[in-house]
Amino acid sequence: NLSTAVVCVAIMVVIIFVACPDYKILVMPVVALVIAGVLLITTVGYRGDRIDAWLHPETSDSGYQTMQSLYAIGSGGLFGKGLGQSIQKLGFLPESHNDMIFAIICEELGLFGALCVIALFVMLIVQLRYIANHARDRYGALVVTGVMTHIAVQMIINIGVVTNVIPNTGVPLPFISYGGTSLAFLMVEMGFVLSVSRQMLPYEAPTKEELQMQQ
């Protein structure tokens, strides 16, 4: 399951960097991962087919789902067809309730609705970063950082696949895609975040001396 591996590696890399912010530590592992990824794509046939479907979805049989997703996004326009009025979800777009749910959001709610969904994710990620920065100890900060990275990377991959920015891979949209297992794990992660947030350090306003030093 390459998509899950990518998410896990991204979480690992971010946590390592936050725990020990030294670029030199990450250079070799990142280079090794890039080389391994290129080898996997070039040596395994079906992964090459996915790349071809990504670059030329209109001429590839494997690009059917991508094309239907783009049709859904394009037909939504600025404000969409209306909630529940999607045509593509009626058997035209595979996995419309799961990995491709963002395309249905674009079709029913338009560009405005899609931007609202993205804005909600950004607000959540910003709040998670705030909690991580004000955690009482390093362990809590790293836990929240891992949750933040998980949600951010999964959202970016899902929206990237739906809009054909990156090759098609099966990653659900956090909190929105159908799937009990994914939602259950996300709820557990948010429970960890709430536990850390209850023990956050109190906010202390900067003193006049600190403000003068910053200026």
PLM segments and residue spans:
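Hydrophobic alpha-helical segments of polytopic membrane proteins
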Residues: L2-T42
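A juxtamembrane structural motif centered on a specific transmembrane helix
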Residues: I157-Q215
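Hydrophobic, glycine- and aromatic-enriched re-entrant/interface helices and adjoining loop segments
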Residues: I25-C116, A135-V143
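Loop-to-helix entry and N-terminal half of a specific, functionally important transmembrane alpha helix
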Residues: A132-G170, I176
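Membrane-proximal intracellular helices of multi-pass ion channels
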Residues: L115, V126-L128, A132-G140, T145, ...
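Structural signal for the C-terminal ends of transmembrane alpha-helices
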Residues: V13-D22, V122-A132, V193-L201
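Hydrophobic alpha-helical segments of membrane proteins
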Residues: L2, V6, G80, A114-A119, ...
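Alpha-helical transmembrane segments of multipass membrane proteins
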Residues: I11, I35-A36, L40, V153, ...
